[in-house]
C-alpha cells in the first residue's frame, strides 16, 4: 500500500491577530485512499468567534451543483444546515471524496456566497463555495475530533463505507501524548507521539523519548 502521515503540535504565537493560548494536537494518517484525521486538546480563550475544523471547502461552478450529507442530496442555491450530532454521518465534497465523522460532533454544511478580504491588499473578495466544518464552539477546552476521509472511492468502496459499522481501522490511542492508528487493510500502524510516552502492550514500541512520527508494517 501507499502510506504516510502528517502531524502538528499547534501553539499560536503572541502576535497581533493571533490567540497565544490556542493549542491543539492534530494528526492525519494516510493508508492507500483512506485518511484518518484526529485532533485532541483543542483549547483557546477566543470567545468572540467559534473555533472550527474544516472538513472541506470547494468552489461552486453552478448554483444547482449538488451537496450531499447524511443521505441528503440538495441542489439548492443556498444551504445552511446544522447537524447537532454527526456521529457516523457521511459528507461528500464536490470532487467525490467522502468524510465520515466518528464522534458526536456538531457539523455545519453551507453552500452559497462567501465574502472575505485579500490577505495583502485587504480588498473585498467573494465567491460561491460549498463547505462542511466541525463547530467546536467559542473558547473550547480540550475539544477533539475524529473523522475518516475516503478519497474518490469506487462503487464497491462506496457500498462498504455506507454500510453500518464500517470501520477500516482501529484507534489504539487518542490523547494529548499520542495518536496511534492501526489500519486493518494494510496492516500498518501509525504513531504520532507529541511528548515522552510509554506504551505497555504495543507490539513494536516500548517508549518514545519525545516527539516522534513512525509507521510500522506487519512483518
Question: What is the role of each PLM region?
Answer:
Residues 1-219:
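Extended repeat-based interaction scaffolds and adjacent low-complexity, acidic/S/T/P-biased segments
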Amino acid at each position: 500500500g501507499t502510506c504516510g502521515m502528517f502531524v502538528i503540535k499547534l501553539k499560536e504565537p503572541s502576535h497581533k491577530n493571533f490567540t497565544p493560548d490556542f493549542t491543539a494536537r492534530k494528526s492525519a494518517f494516510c493508508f492507500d485512499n483512506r485518511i484518518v484525521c484526529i485532533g485532541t486538546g483543542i483549547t483557546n480563550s477566543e470567545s468572540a468567534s467559534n473555533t472550527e475544523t474544516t472538513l472541506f471547502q470547494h468552489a461552486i461552478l453552478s448554483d444547482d451543483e449538488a451537496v450531499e450529507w447524511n443521505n441528503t442530496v440538495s441542489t439548492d442555491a443556498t444551504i445552511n444546515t446544522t447537524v447537532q450530532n454527526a456521529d457516523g454521518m457521511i459528507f461528500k465534497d464536490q470532487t467525490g471524496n467522502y468524510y465520515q465523522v466518528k464522534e458526536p460532533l456538531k457539523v455545519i454544511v453551507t453552500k452559497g456566497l462567501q465574502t472575505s478580504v485579500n490577505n495583502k491588499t485587504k480588498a473585498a473578495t467573494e465567491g460561491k463555495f460549498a463547505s462542511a466544518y466541525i463547530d467546536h464552539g467559542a473558547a473550547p477546552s480540550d475539544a477533539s475530533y475524529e473523522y475518516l476521509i475516503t478519497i474518490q472511492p469506487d462503487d464497491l468502496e462506496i457500498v462498504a463505507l455506507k454500510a453500518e459499522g464500517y470501520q477500516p481501522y482501529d484507534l489504539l490511542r487518542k490523547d494529548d501524548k499520542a495518536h496511534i492508528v492501526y489500519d486493518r487493510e494494510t496492516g500498518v500502524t501509525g504513531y504520532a507521539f507529541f511528548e515522552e510516552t510509554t506504551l505497555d502492550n504495543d507490539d513494536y514500541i516500548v517508549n518514545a523519548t519525545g516527539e516522534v512520527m513512525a509507521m510500522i508494517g506487519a512483518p
